């Protein structure tokens, strides 16, 4: 076998359509675009969501809700993630140093998901009732 004898398998490659190259090609004259109209013109596209002048769906439906700005500075952390924090005291700066919450976060809540394996002191963070019980069961404590 030589490199100059290699060729793709039969039927695996399709030749590109040669549009507008004579009537005999089957794609000459109008080039598969039909006659006249917006879609036959160059650059003739209809915007996504355009319904021909009818009031579009995204404008017919009412607006709802908003994004709370508090969510930008709040975060949740799971119990099993506390194990990634070095030291016995888990507070906001320790979580940021471990890369578990972003730098702009001001409020963190510990959620019971997974389990905590060692005794830790959670300082200055909010905790759910289940998370608080799990931390205390492991010999740790939660300080507000």
UniProtKB/Swiss-Prot annotation:
Residues 21-31 have a biased composition (Gly residues). Pfam families: Ribosomal_L27A. Residues 32-44 have a biased composition (Basic residues). Coiled coil: none annotated. Residues 1-52 are annotated as: Disordered. The keyword Heme does not apply. Transmembrane segments: none annotated. Keywords: Ribonucleoprotein, Ribosomal protein, RNA-binding, rRNA-binding. InterPro entries: Ribosomal_uL15, Ribosomal_uL15/eL18, Ribosomal_uL15/eL18_sf, Ribosomal_uL15_bac-type. GO terms for biological process: translation. The keyword rRNA-binding applies. GO terms for molecular function: rRNA binding; structural constituent of ribosome. NCBIfam families: rplO_bact (TIGR01071). Binds to the 23S rRNA. Belongs to the universal ribosomal protein uL15 family. Part of the 50S ribosomal subunit. This is Large ribosomal subunit protein uL15. It comes from Pseudoalteromonas translucida (strain TAC 125).
